[in-house]
């Protein structure tokens, strides 16, 4: 568990998966072992000794102005997915966020930077054969543009993540489609960063003269800080 402070805001990172299974050939074809070797600071945290990318699926838990905010909800348990590492998982995510002070019943906001299966999975959980919102007291915040896109899209080859992880939230009355400048607290707000998806947003955090940005999938790996054109 990693934790940072940005002024009065606390940010905690909860990792669901972290490994070298990400295919550079698909996601970042220029990130070859030879090219990565030239970026020395990537080892040992972001690249293996063999030159493979280390990537993670994680949530960020944000405490601001008395509000508990979960940013991106990872993969989830019990979800049918074509990617083997994502399929029918049985992880301890809820135990880990509870240990960080974010018991699911006490979360105030859930924010998805975009609507892809590795960012929406724990929006819901399987209860007696039904997908129900994991966070029963939370307002779920979605980019209106991203939901308009996903709502009309055919079921993805990756799995029906709209059906099992997003629509049940709207069915419960907890889902809200918002503009890309929506403000969650005085210290935390959305900013439009489309491209990876039509309505992708980043989350800006500013408090007491300090700032941070949660970029979602604006970038896929730290190597892109050194090589943005990848």
Residue ranges and their predicted role:
Residues 61, 191, 201-223, 228:
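Metal-dependent phosphodiesterase/nuclease catalytic metal-binding core
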Residues 82-84, 120-130:
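Metal-dependent catalytic neighborhoods of phosphoester/phosphodiester hydrolases
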Residues 74-76, 116, 146, 194, ...:
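Catalytic metal-binding/acid-base residues of hydrolase active sites
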Residues 45-50, 128-129, 190-191:
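Short, P/G- and charge-enriched loop/turn segments at secondary-structure junctions
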Residues 1-102, 106-118, 125, 134-192, 210-216:
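Metallo-beta-lactamase
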Residues 120-122, 189-201:
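Active-site glycine- and acidic-residue-rich loops that bind
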């Amino acid at each position: 568990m990693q934790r940072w402070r940005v002024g009065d805001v606390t940010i905690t990172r909860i990792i669901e998966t972290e490994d070298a299974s990400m295919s550079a050939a698909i996601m970042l074809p220029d990130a070859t072992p030879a090219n990565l070797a030239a970026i020395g600071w990537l080892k040992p945290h972001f690249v293996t000794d063999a030159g493979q990318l280390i990537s993670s699926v994680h949530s960020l838990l944000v405490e601001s102005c008395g509000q508990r905010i979960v940013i991106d909800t990872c993969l989830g348990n019990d979800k049918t997915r074509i990617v083997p590492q994502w399929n029918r998982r049985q992880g301890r995510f809820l135990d880990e966020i509870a240990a960080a002070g974010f018991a699911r019943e006490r979360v105030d906001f859930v924010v998805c930077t975009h609507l892809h299966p590795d960012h929406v999975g724990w929006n819901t959980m399987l209860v007696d054969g039904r997908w129900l919102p994991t966070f029963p007291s939370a307002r779920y915040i979605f980019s209106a543009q991203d939901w308009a896109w996903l709502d009309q899209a055919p079921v993805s080859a990756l799995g029906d993540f709209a059906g099992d992880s997003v629509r049940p939230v709207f069915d419960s009355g907890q889902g809200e489609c918002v503009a890309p400048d929506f403000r969650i607290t005085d210290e935390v707000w959305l900013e439009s960063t489309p491209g990876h998806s039509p309505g992708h947003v980043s989350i800006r955090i500013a408090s007491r003269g300090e700032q941070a940005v949660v970029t979602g999938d604006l970038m896929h790996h730290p190597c892109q800080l050194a090589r943005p054109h990848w």
